[in-house]
A protein has these predicted regions:
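Intrinsically disordered, low-complexity Ser/Thr- and Pro-rich stretches
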Residues: 5-7, 19, 153-154
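Bacterial N-terminal signal peptides
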Residues: 17-29
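Signature for phosphate-centric chemistry
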Residues: 37-116, 122-327, 331-380
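N-terminal secretory signal peptides that target proteins for export/translocation
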Residues: 1-14
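Intrinsically disordered, low-complexity regions enriched in Ser/Pro/Gly/Gln/His and often acidic
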Residues: 8, 25, 64-67
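Intrinsically disordered, low-complexity segments enriched in Ser/Pro/Gly/Ala and basic residues
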Residues: 4-6, 23, 37, 213
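Signal peptide processing junction and immediate N-terminal pro/mature segment
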Residues: 31-36
Length: 380
């Protein structure tokens, strides 16, 4: 089955209707911003979500050199969504169902709502499982169809660099990141010295110093990326992102406090350390040119899907058939960072840093029809 008729970067010359949507998206906030006016009707909701809580992508053996104590064990293999991750995603689905039923996009009747929901996921276990659980919670009608490409296929919607969508300029991407930090990545090590020192104290215990050579002794560098990303950031900032991501996953999975950062990471410390995590993604994924390359194809299909709902007829490039009321796109933290950077979106969640990329977090695009006006829509 073909889900996307074409893959491409955002066009320079938009059709008038699409240009209006883009202007709305650039001005509007994400998720639920200002309340809709009385009498307005929700025509379509597009949920761009990260998968749920998973185990770290790297094995404990691969992470061993980053700490003086063994990392906690997980009940699932690396990169697999956990049972608690499944349960938390189900709660998100319950929330979306209640909200969209109240707004009129869903009815609460599974037989009616089933055909109104379309789910498109990347082909990892964690993304497919998130789509499946969200679909069950949204509709409550058996097992939903989760549309994805064959396993092992680089999906141009979620992994455009690996799928070779377009011809990105790697040197330009590196220059764009370096331009934000004065051309010297070592400035990051100095600017975030306090957070790095706190992290090393957690990783290596009192004194924050390993017995031998530490990867944190290497300076941060910025260079051309690999098949997944245009830009590679290595050194302390990269290792800090890996470690803080592990702490977030341990905490979100409900591990005992003694296992979250070996008992040395409480909520305050986790909030502080997230500054290092979000710094990495802000530079590598939200810098405008990398965000444009990584997010423009996905954003273009989102815009086509909004246009299809407004016109009430099929539009090439739209995700799902005409008539859907909820479209779920299940991807990764990089997808949310790319689209957020492309559209200039910023968000805050209590207990985190700016623009957090939490498991199960989402950007939600809503198309509303103005009450009492013919063919008048807005996006928020």
């Amino acid at each position: 089955m073909t889900f996307l008729p074409r893959s491409r970067a955002i066009r320079i010359g938009f059709r008038p209707a699409v240009a209006a949507f883009v202007a709305s998206l650039l001005v509007c906030a994400f998720a639920w911003a200002a309340p809709a006016a009385s009498g307005d009707e929700l025509q379509l909701a597009i949920i761009l979500t990260r998968h749920g809580v998973r185990s770290p992508l790297k094995t404990n053996e691969a992470m061993a050199r980053l700490a003086s104590q063994p990392w906690p064990s997980w009940e699932v293999a690396p990169g697999i969504q956990t049972p608690r991750g499944n349960a938390l995603i189900a709660l998100m689905g319950d929330y979306y169902r209640a909200r969209f039923a109240e707004a009129g996009a869903l009815t609460g009747d599974p037989a009616v709502d089933g055909p109104r929901v379309f789910i498109r996921a990347d082909n990892d276990q964690r993304t497919i499982e998130t789509g499946r659980i969200l679909g069950k919670s949204l509709v409550r009608l058996g097992e939903p169809d989760v549309h994805s490409l064959a396993a092992g296929t680089a999906d141009p919607l979620f992994r455009p660099v690996r799928a070779h969508v377009g011809h990105p300029d790697v040197a330009r991407a590196v220059a764009a990141v370096l331009g934000r930090i004065g051309g010297d990545p070592r400035r990051l090590d100095r600017a975030y010295a306090a957070q790095l020192a706190e992290l090393k104290g957690i990783l290596f215990g009192p004194g924050g110093a390993p017995l031998g050579a530490s990867p944190f002794d290497e300076p941060t560098t910025v260079r051309p990326g690999d098949q997944e990303s245009l830009v590679t950031i290595s050194g302390p900032i990269y290792f800090a992102e890996q470690c803080t991501e592990s702490f977030v996953l341990e905490y979100a999975d409900g591990m005992p406090a003694s296992d979250v950062g070996w008992g040395r990471v409480d909520e305050r410390a986790l909030t502080d350390l997230l500054a290092l995590h979000e710094l990495f993604f802000d530079l590598a994924q939200r810098t405008y040119y990398p965000a444009q390359v990584g997010g423009s194809n996905l954003a273009s299909h989102i815009i086509d899907t909004l246009e299809q709902a407004a016109l009430g007829q099929p539009v090439p490039g739209a995700v799902g058939p005409s008539g859907e009321r909820v479209v779920v796109l299940v991807g990764h933290d990089t997808n949310i960072a790319n689209v957020g950077g492309l559209f200039g979106m910023n968000w805050m969640i209590p207990g985190t840093q700016a623009n957090p990329l939490v498991p199960g977090g989402a950007l939600v695009f809503e198309l509303w029809k103005r009450g009492g006006e013919q063919n008048s829509f807005y996006v928020r």
